[in-house]
Structure formats: C-alpha cells, structure tokens
C-alpha cells in the first residue's frame, strides 16, 4: 500500500518480496527487495590446504548454494604440492579467485618465497590478502595498497569489511610474533611481526569505527596461552583458528 505521504508498505510473514513504486505520471520508478525474518551470513573457511586444490570446487559450490555467504582461506595454503611450489603460490591464489573467495589470510608458511614475491602473487586474488601484524622492511603492513588482478580493489593490508545482506562483517588476521622471529624466507627476507595484542586492539577499534555489525579475528599462526579469551574480551565476535583441522 501507498499512503498520502508516499510511504510504501508491504506485509509478509517471512522470506522476501519486491516492491516497485512508480510516480503518478509514470516518469520514474524504483524497485527494491525487502527481506523479512531472521537473516544469517554463513562464513565458510578453508585452511592448511598446502597447495591442494581438490577441495576448492566443493568450497565454490557450497558458497554458490548458500545465499549471502562469505568464503575465505585462513592461511597455510599456498605451498606444499609440486605444482604449487613451481609457481610460488600464484597457482593457489588464482584458484582461490576462480572459486570466488572473498579474502585470504596469510600464515607465516605462506611467505616461503619471500615477502616481495608473495605481494606480487597476491595480485592474482580477487579478494584482499591480509596479514595484520606482519610488516615489510618499511614498517607498513605487508599487503598495504596491494591490488587484485582486476585493479579495482585496493587493501590496507590490515583489515577488510565484507557487506552481506545489509550487514557489515569485519575481518583481521594475526600471526604469532614469536614464531615470526625464527622464520625467514629462503631469499633472505625476514618477517617482522608487531605485538599481537596491540595490533588486535587497533584493528578492532578501526572496524568498530567502520560500523561493523560483527568482527572476526582470523588466527593464521597461534601463540601459546589463552589467546582466544584475550581476543574475545577485546570485542571480537568470533575467532577462526587457521591452525585447527576443522577449518580445512
């Protein structure tokens, strides 16, 4: 119905309906979709694939069959098979793009061919690559201002916001500084990691300021101790632990 003020109202118990409003003279119309009832945003994650692409078709099908879903990789997935090693990780990033991944978290093991090479390869991804507390030798986030193959996406390298079904879902990625200190790439590029808690606090604040309805921390390389409790107490809605087999 349309009242005298031009307010359009529709009623449905659940599901969705389409409303089209047209001016009396027929010169202009607007169509919008209205959804009623509980709306969820499913998040699917892979991790620890180590160069194995056999499950990516299933992941793509799962996302395609699930409205409003988000698909991501939580790290440790670029290297491990002969074909993946031949391309230094580019093979997997291209496969992620083809499967419709929304973002990629980078674990320490994903830097096996060096920071410079990985940043270049990350351009093959359709979604942003993130490593919030890993820094390059200029002291900025490794993936700061990295772009996608289509050149229409720029990331700050620390966090990203994905919008689904009217919700803003924020993501950031953490790696253990203690492990980063003992891992270096074969070409001599060393990985520098910022403090875990300081980085988490900064990303949570930034995502809250961005108006996120939920904030997810992706932990690609976990530290010792009760880190889950620490993250949740800072305002994280949920944690994706890339080191656990359940995400594979």
Task: Give a label for each model feature.
Residues 18, 35-248:
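Acidic, metal/ion-coordinating pockets
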